[in-house]
Amino acid sequence: MRKYIPLVLFIFSWPVLCADIHGRVVRVLDGDTIEVMDSRKAVRIRLVNIDAPEKKQDYGRWSTDMMKSLVAGKTVTVTYFQRDRYGRMLGQVYAPDGMNVNQFMVRAGAAWVYEQYNTDPVLPVLQNEARQQKRGLWSDADPVPPWIWRHRK
């Protein structure tokens, strides 16, 4: 019974661990990083649970363009959980119509599930669907995940 106490505390503290930002996207850096104007300053957001191709990687520019078409200049809602080691907020991004942008990027084949850190059980299902239907980066016979591509560079 005692081993479940930390889990129960975590579950009940979840609402305290996350917060929302509402703001206009002022910059799209790549397929998984945006800047949102929050009150008076731009806040860098790293989309949680996904990893998009790097700009110089195959499909990198396409992934960035996909993100731009979804959110550039639009007001989004970001549910953020924490900051990463680079100071970026890790968050779930929702388009003005409520669409989950993180999930859309994976479904479109514009990003991988960041399996090492993923907490969204829907993402692997969406990635398998994109792979089977050869969407986006999955149209490549052997796409290289960004974490492997970065390691090689």
Curated annotation (Swiss-Prot):
Q: Which UniProt keywords apply?
A: Endonuclease, Hydrolase, Nuclease, Plasmid, Signal
- Active site, renumbered: R46, E54, R88
> Looking at the keywords, is Signal present?
yes
Q: From which organism does this entry originate?
A: Escherichia coli O157:H7
The family line of this record is: Belongs to the thermonuclease family.
Which residues does UniProt assign to the signal peptide? 1-19
EC number from the UniProt entry: 3.1.-.-
Query: Could you confirm whether the keyword Signal appears in this record?
Result: yes
Q: What name does this protein carry?
A: Uncharacterized endonuclease
Record-linked PROSITE patterns: TNASE_1, TNASE_2, TNASE_3
Source superkingdom: Bacteria
Q: Which GO terms describe its molecular function?
A: endonuclease activity; nucleic acid binding
Q: Which SMART domains match?
A: SNc
